[in-house]
């Protein structure tokens, strides 16, 4: 399978919201093994969300779509206070969880999905990202030379890492690495984690399904994200690297370049 077969992608999109200038691109590829793509992405000025469905056949695809459809209702023309947006997201996730559980009862399949990403909000009048996560999809940030995973995986191996029983390197090859502990649907707890982080003068943000970080190390991801190429090429390189490493799962990436109005975006 080439990088173009079955691939969905956006062109570079530009937007300004709440004093932050943004450009972004999203790519979703089924990978080299899976016949269907159960990932989904939702993007707009100040809203960058991803869902990785599970359940086989069309159940996972329906689950991820249901989550993103519910979360789309949170979008507004200007950023709202972080606490208000958080409460809205919790309500929408609850609605999505109920809808996905109904998929189980109608089809007999245990549908579920992860959700991760960022929404631009304000905190004490200053632009902040509200980061949300449930499951093992990830949100990263590269700013001022510092690369960090903003989210924490809800997975068995992450719990073992936290308990000191596995190293991150061991977790990458552990047979339990794909077992998640939270999701929307799938008979799991739908409790999301949230973080409120200040928007930086210039930052690159990456939202991805585990089809990316399951194939590439954080160092490999950082090297590509830190390269001096347009963000569409950066996204292409991330997906291509995951496919070249095996492409055993669907691979979806959202790459965002964000700059506050106090600095020159130099686009």
PLM segments and residue spans:
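PP2C/PPM-type serine/threonine phosphatase catalytic domain
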Residues: 2-267
């Amino acid at each position: 399978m080439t990088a173009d077969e079955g691939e969905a992608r956006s062109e570079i999109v530009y937007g300004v919201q709440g004093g932050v200038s943004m450009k972004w691109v999203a790519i979703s590829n089924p990978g080299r093994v899976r016949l269907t793509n159960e990932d989904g992405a939702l993007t707009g000025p100040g809203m960058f969300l991803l869902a990785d469905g599970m359940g086989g056949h069309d159940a996972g695809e329906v689950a991820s779509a249901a989550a993103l459809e519910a979360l789309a209702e949170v979008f507004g023309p200007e950023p709202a206070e972080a606490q208000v947006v958080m409460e809205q997201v919790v309500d929408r996730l609850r609605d999505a969880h109920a809808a996905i559980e109904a998929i189980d009862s109608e089809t007999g399949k245990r549908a579920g999905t992860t959700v991760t990403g960022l929404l631009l909000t304000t905190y004490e009048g200053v632009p902040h990202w509200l980061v949300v996560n449930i499951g093992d999809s990830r949100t990263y940030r590269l700013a001022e030379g510092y690369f960090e995973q903003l989210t924490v995986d809800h997975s068995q191996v992450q719990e073992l890492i936290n308990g000191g029983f596995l190293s991150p390197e061991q977790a990458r090859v552990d047979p339990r690495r794909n077992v998640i502990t939270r999701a929307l649907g799938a008979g799991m707890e739908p409790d999301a984690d949230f973080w409120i982080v200040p928007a930086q003068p210039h930052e690159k943000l990456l939202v991805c399904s585990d089809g990316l970080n399951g194939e590439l190390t954080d160092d490999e991801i950082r090297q590509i994200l830190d390269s001096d190429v347009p963000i569409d090429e950066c996204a292409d390189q991330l997906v291509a690297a995951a496919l070249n490493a095996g492409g055993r799962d669907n691979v979806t990436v959202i790459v965002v370049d964000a700059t506050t109005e106090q600095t020159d975006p130099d686009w």
